[in-house]
């Protein structure tokens, strides 16, 4: 499996997936920490990929997603965006709504 296939599999296999620096318990950058906190507030489980431990994904994902920075939030196979978008969506209530709908529709 090449790196693009690995990325596609991760995105397909996880309803809510964040590509981040570090882990949810120990984020390695402020943006990843803020994004994880926003996701945690929404109250649903999410998967993560630590790009610091997966350098091939760190290199290829920005090209694949056409999004240059991390973290990257994917919900039901769709790129939502990075930290600023996640925080904006949390503030206006859209993040909880989109996450709840994704989880409900997957059952």
UniProtKB/Swiss-Prot annotation:
Organism, as annotated: Buchnera aphidicola subsp. Schizaphis graminum (strain Sg)
Main localization of the protein described in the UniProt heading: cytoplasm
UniProt cross-references to InterPro entries, sorted A to Z: Glutaredoxin, GRX_PICOT-like, Monothiol_GRX, Monothiol_GRX-rel, Thioredoxin-like_sf
Record-listed [2Fe-2S] cluster binding positions: 29
Keyword Iron-sulfur included in the entry's annotation: yes
Domain Glutaredoxin: residue ranges: 4-106
Localization of this protein: Cytoplasm
GO molecular function, one term: metal ion binding
Coiled-coil spans in chain: none
Record's keyword annotation contains RNA-binding: no
Described function: Monothiol glutaredoxin involved in the biogenesis of iron-sulfur clusters.
Annotated family: Belongs to the glutaredoxin family. Monothiol subfamily.
Subunit organization: Homodimer.
Record key words, sorted: 2Fe-2S, Cytoplasm, Iron, Iron-sulfur, Metal-binding, Redox-active center
GO CC annotations on file: cytoplasm
Residue sites binding glutathione per the record: 21, 58, 70, 83-84
Name under which the protein is recorded: Glutaredoxin 4
Pfam family, one: Glutaredoxin
PROSITE patterns, A to Z: GLUTAREDOXIN_2
